[in-house]
Amino acid sequence: MYAPYATMPDRSRGRAVPEEESSFRSPFQRDRDRIIHASAFRRLKHKTQVFVEHEGDNYRTRLTHSIEVGQVARTIAGALGLNQELTEAVALAHDLGHTPFGHTGEDALHEMMAPYGGFDHNAQAIRIVTALERHYAEFDGLNLTWETLEAIAKHNGPVVGELPWALAACNRGIDLELHTHASAEAQVAALADDIAYNHHDLHDGLRAGLFTDDDVCSLSIIAPAYAEVDEIYPGLDHNRRRHEALRRFFGVMVSDVIETSRRKIAASGAQSVEEIRALDHAVVTFSDEIWTQLRELRAFMFTRMYRAPSVMVVRERVAVVVKALFAYYLENTMAMPERWHGDIRKAETETDRARIVSDYIAGMTDRFALQLYDRLALGA
């Protein structure tokens, strides 16, 4: 049973290319399934967030992260009476536009693309699902519903100011009403992303030895979880103690979003998805108390993990890889795989060519980018 403010599948604004409706899947189920079967989604298996792929099999990748975000998003959406299929579709698609090597790769590609409009991973996700996936006979992209496109574009809130070129190109053909908030389903996907990375980055950092359990017990949002585990399970072995504490931390975040969002939605008086979009604030959020504690956690993680010396050494190296690949292919565009040659022949300006090169590099996995860099002897 949907809440009145949920996105109703039978009221979808449809797809850019009209299609016959399925007799057994909702429009948003079809969107989710198309995302799962997209080649860009499969490539997330070999794209990392903090640790480069070869550093260990137990660290999260973009794919495992996206699956975790989807699970959290469905849970929260169900508790709030929202459309779980739409929420999950957005959650699974939110990282499609990421480059190899996480935000380091994105920063390097954005630097190289600065003369040509820059690079933005959220806009690239839209570009992938509207243009770059080329498997269907009747359209490029995945031909997703308006609601799913809107949610991918605006899951972090209204898009104001100058638009990234890839998003502007899409919006010229499909007005996504970028100045408004997105549906509550999109807002849930954004918070689920926060919850998932807060949890798994902490776990991965502990596993990597960048900090200890005692270190994280200094954090106000983590300490109660360890204290509760120690009280209930005295003498528990190290790994089980950590797992039990982190799952409690995870549960605190999920419960807080559900309880806080219920109150905010009720206070807003919204009775439709249109009224959710028309509000001047998001309705799916953490409480002020948890936000404060999470800011403390993020400051800790920034210092101890994201800017740890061992991580920074690798980041500097992979940034060189991305920049070298971009420079090489901008000078040698026809050296790109044959599937790109049609686009290259249509390119009229250097900006057009640079954006094609950007598409190619952004789609690479960590492993492929490193192997290609070595094969081309770009570090010689």
Swiss-Prot record:
InterPro entries: dGTPase, Diverse_Catalytic_Enzymes, dNTPase_2, HD/PDEase_dom, HD_domain, PHydrolase_assoc_dom. CDD domains: HDc. Belongs to the dGTPase family. Type 2 subfamily. Residues 1-28 are annotated as: Disordered. Pfam families: HD, HD_assoc. Transmembrane segments: none annotated. It comes from Ruegeria sp. (strain TM1040). The keyword Metal-binding does not apply. This is Deoxyguanosinetriphosphate triphosphohydrolase-like protein. Residues 62-198 form the HD domain. Keywords: Hydrolase. NCBIfam families: dGTP_triPase, PRK01286.1-1, PRK01286.1-3. It comes from the Bacteria.
